[in-house]
Amino acid sequence: MYRKTWMQVNLDKIERNLIQLKEICQKKIIAVLKADAYGCGDIHVARAVLEAGAEMIAVSSLDEALVLRNEGYEEKLLILGATEASDIPILIKHSISCTAYSTEWVIKAIKQNCEGLHVHLKVDTGMSRIGFRTIDELHLAFEKLQAANCDMEGIFTHFCCADSNLNLTNLQFSKFKEAVESFSYTFPWVHCDNSDATAFFQEDTSNACRIGISLYGISTYEKSLEPAISLYSEVVMVKHMHAGDTVGYGATYTAKDDEIIATLPIGYADGFVRANQGRKVYVDGQYAEIVGRVCMDQVMIHLEQEVPVKTVVEIFGEHISLEKMAEELNTIPYEIICLLSSRVTRRYIWHNQIQYEENSRLEKSILTKERK
């Protein structure tokens, strides 16, 4: 029923990665499951990370938090991004923590009935995204929110170069430490270390680490983590081409001799971008070049040895790492997996076997039909 293209998410490996990272940082773990757990499926990944010992889950927006609440998750949830002050009643009702990031937001928040709202103060130490830039602004926000009977649950910042620039990371940390130590109040949650910083940056100001991409075994520094996600497709047709035959839109590939070309059901509508032309995939012991332009729904590969229809093709995984694919595309692993669309089925391995196989588009179609 599904197109034969799927992302495989190994929840066992995600659990083991989190346990290992918790041992490294020796602090509370905030599992960052933004953007549907980076496209891997927040509902299932949440279950795995909580069983492995995560004490809090962080998401990007209110709708992401409500998805987890509506699925029955009662654990601590933190929204890292901006929220509307008008949504405060929803945040309080569902016990969802939010980020206070500007004086303007605080003024709007205290005009609401924000008693009992769980708040984390965001300190902008150099990312220049959201957050308070001065200690005076930070204290003013704290005083106003505390006076409004908000629960001042946490304070945090975000490193912009933890994977590449230790000097800038040290500078950001110094600013954050100064901000934290300027309070006589003890925040229950103090966090600054992201995935890469957790693996190498030792500090004693924070009491929690935010783990995101490293859950999936992707880390600049910690090479012992297990890659937990892979992408596969299947051969749907094999063609024997002759010299001079062309392949794909624009006829950008011409066969030089008799060649074997196979078609896979994956294209740029699945998030497999056109820049993949010329890269290689792995099929039945051979690396096969992607030839011709990547189409919306399909792509063609050149085979040295013929394979049967339904042969599984690895886009990234054991033989082609996600990091290698990202390097070849001049991007980052985050972007590749977040771009994988809802057309791509998610297959979940847990307790060493396939536990779930989901395609949200088909499930929505079935639900709509049932409602009629």
Model segments located where?
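Active-site anion/phosphate-binding pocket segments in diverse small-molecule metabolic enzymes
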Residues: 2-11, 15, 64, 83-85, ...
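Active-site-proximal beta-alpha core segment in soluble small-molecule metabolic enzymes
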Residues: 5-9, 13-16, 27-182, 186-191, ...
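Conserved PLP-enzyme active-site core in the AAT-like
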Residues: 24
